[in-house]
């Protein structure tokens, strides 16, 4: 991380903090007034973004904020994140615009089991026949359509069609297809099975490590210390930050575009001589700021414990 007394570094850090605040607003799904079932409060969650190749065989096929990634291989393709209940049509159109076939999807993966990242899974699995692979901890949630979620399971507006999991993943598991290997890193806390995906890819004769961050954010209302449905939440967050800080990262990506300033980098990608998504400093700063926000909230709750839910 750059020295804090470096003016340029301080400017970059302020940018990260601004993004972090915006991300918190975008992902604080329990902070908004309850909305009708599957209403989409953020227009960037549903507004399409032209699909594009990030690097090598890794492509972006999501909306302006809800990230979905296509990893192409010689033996079919892997999709990361099905997003909202309304998202499969947009994701399919993006995949086909890139020249790939919808029914060539072999595996479906997710970042975590919140409805804005996995509500479309049942439809995609039904249409493509892909195998669904989910991290332990999130499996009961996706198979119950969100009802087993420790925070949102009783709120109808955050439920979605249940989907059967074909393979239960564990930390460091490898997902292999054709000549591609992805590694699942458990970075729990945000959900019990929140997953950060990593892969090594080749682009322009160089090797890059891509990191797709699941979510290290503490949503408003999370009881870090005394949640009877998730008593190890704080410990899981701490372990997740340890993992995130240990990962090498060249290409900084995530479950929401706001995590990594996607829209600005997308515009730069069109004209820049270097790949704008190569941002190891941005990755380190984002993780550090999220960890700082977690530590601050944990200290606050230790001083003033939240009411334990029934």
Where do the model's predicted regions map?
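Active-site environment of divalent metal-dependent phosphoester hydrolases
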Residues: 87, 113-119, 139-142, 192-195, ...
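Active-site neighborhood of phospho(di)ester-bond hydrolases with catalytic His/Asp-centered motifs
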Residues: 80-82, 106-113, 133-135, 187-188, ...
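Divalent-metal (often Zn2+) His-rich catalytic cores of metallo-beta-lactamase-fold enzymes
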Residues: 199, 204-206, 218, 229-309
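Divalent metal-coordination and catalytic microenvironments
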Residues: 57, 71, 81, 112, ...
């Amino acid at each position: 991380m750059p020295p804090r007394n470096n003016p340029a570094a301080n400017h970059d850090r302020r940018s990260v903090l601004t993004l972090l605040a915006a991300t918190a607003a975008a992902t604080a799904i329990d902070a908004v007034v309850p909305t009708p079932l599957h209403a989409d409060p953020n227009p960037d969650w549903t507004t399409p973004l032209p699909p594009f190749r990030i690097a090598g065989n890794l492509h972006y096929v999501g909306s302006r904020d809800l990230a979905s990634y296509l990893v192409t291989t010689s033996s079919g393709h892997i999709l990361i994140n099905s997003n909202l209940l309304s998202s499969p049509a947009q994701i399919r159109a993006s995949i086909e615009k890139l020249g790939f076939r919808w029914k060539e999807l072999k595996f479906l993966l997710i970042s975590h089991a919140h409805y804005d990242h996995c509500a479309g899974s049942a439809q995609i699995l039904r249409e493509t026949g892909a195998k669904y692979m989910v991290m332990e901890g999130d499996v009961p949630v996706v198979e119950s359509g969100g009802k087993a979620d420790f925070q949102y399971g009783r709120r109808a507006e955050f439920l979605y069609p249940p989907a059967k999991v074909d393979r239960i993943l564990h930390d460091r598991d490898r997902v292999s297809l054709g000549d591609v290997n992805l590694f699942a890193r458990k970075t729990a806390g945000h959900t019990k099975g929140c997953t950060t995906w990593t892969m090594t890819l080749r682009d322009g004769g160089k090797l890059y490590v891509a990191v797709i961050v699941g979510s290290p954010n503490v949503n408003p209302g999370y009881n870090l210390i005394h949640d009877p449905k998730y008593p190890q939440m704080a410990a899981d967050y701490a372990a997740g930050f340890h993992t995130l800080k240990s990962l090498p990262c060249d290409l900084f990506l995530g479950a929401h575009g706001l995590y990594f300033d996607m829209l600005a980098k997308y515009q730069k990608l069109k004209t820049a001589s270097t790949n704008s998504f190569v941002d190891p400093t941005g990755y380190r700063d984002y993780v550090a700021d999220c960890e700082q926000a977690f530590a601050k909230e944990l200290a606050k709750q230790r001083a003033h414990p939240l009411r334990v839910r029934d």
